[in-house]
Amino acid sequence: MVSTHIGGPAETVTVFVALSVGAIFIDLFMHRHDKPISLKSAALWSVFWVVVAMAFAGFLYVHHGAEVASLFVTGYALEKVLSVDNLFVMMAIFSWFSVPDRYRHRGLYWGIIGAIVFRGIFVAIGTGLLSLGPYVELIFAVVVAWTAVMMLKGGGDDDEIEDYSQHLAYRLVKRFFPIWPKLSGHAFLLTQKEVDAELAKPENKDVSVGRLKKAALYATPLMLCVAVVELSDVMFAFDSVPAIIAVSREPLIVYSAMMFAILGLRTLYFVLEALKQYLSQLEKAVIVLLFFIAFKLGLNATDHIWHHGYSLSATTSLYVVLGVLALGILASVIFPEKPEAENKES
């Protein structure tokens, strides 16, 4: 782990905020209408977010040097790769709630806003905990390694469909709001007046919600879906934040790397959804990277305890992350996933 200290210089923070907020407004303006996002559009927007991140990396290179820029790019690439598995979970959630493609971008937006907030909290806590000593790094190493082991053991469970009605987030929303059973545009909540208007429609004559027992607000399936996505991402952050902190203890580097990676996830989601069957080996790449990060954390912790002198530079970490990602993509091309019908026949 590299502990390059840059603090929180006003100029760097200003550029970070201006780039990220400006790009968010551009994205929101261009996607203000509820319509499906094509693969071409998603790919172009994914490139846009990578360019924004690399622009910030260029700023760091000019103002703070190659080492800091390398740490940022390593953290950014690592968060992108680790997020792939999380995006596949999001696909399963949207599918289970039967959310149409035209509403998924809006649902992802609110899910990612929550991710940005919680990542900030976890980064502050994580970097603060590491200041307590090397034994905290060992704990982080065990957490990351355990995640890799569980992913390895659960590799064959991809076809199992989870019942998200038993999810904690689902049950929490249901405790505070009655549930309107149908989507109502991109609305997350409906007022009693809106529910009455829905109940007046012939196709809703069999719906009993809101007829006898009235309420101020009703949660829609889109609200339930976003709540499940949000809590699932929080659980994912428990694994990803220690992994990114393994790259650097500098909060600004860690958070900015995660922030720019997360902001591009909405459009990356649609790219992965279209190319999912062609990226079948990426999960294995994620597992390899988690073991690498656990090793890096453990190596750094034992160096602090026993002073053996071994460590991995930021450049080496960057090469490993990019190399494993490239191998994962190459393996997916060489060993593509068999279609379901072919799997059943064999």
Swiss-Prot record:
The record's listing under PANTHER family reads: MEMBRANE BOUND PREDICTED REDOX MODULATOR, THYLAKOID MEMBRANE PROTEIN TERC, CHLOROPLASTIC
GO annotations under biological process? response to tellurium ion
Q: Does the keyword Signal apply?
A: no
Q: What does this protein do?
A: Could conceivably alter the intracellular level of tellurium in a manner leading to resistance. Alternatively its presence in the membrane may provide a barrier to entry of the tellurium ions.
Stored InterPro entries? Integral_membrane_TerC, Integral_membrane_TerC_rswitch
Q: Which NCBIfam families match?
A: R_switched_Alx
Identify the coding gene.
terC
Q: Which Pfam families match?
A: TerC (PF03741)
> Could you identify this protein by its name?
Tellurium resistance protein TerC
Whether Heme counts among this entry's keywords is no
Q: Where is this protein found?
A: Cell membrane
Organism, by scientific name, is Alcaligenes sp
Top-level lineage group: Bacteria
Q: What is its main location?
A: membrane
Q: Which family does it belong to?
A: Belongs to the TerC family.
UniProtKB keywords: Cell membrane, Membrane, Plasmid, Tellurium resistance, Transmembrane, Transmembrane helix
- Specify the taxonomic lineage: Bacteria, Pseudomonadati, Pseudomonadota, Betaproteobacteria, Burkholderiales
Q: How does it sit in the membrane?
A: Multi-pass membrane protein
- TM regions (residue ranges): 6-26, 42-62, 81-101, 110-130, 132-152, 227-247, 252-272, 286-306, 316-336
**Cellular component GO terms held in the UniProt record:** plasma membrane
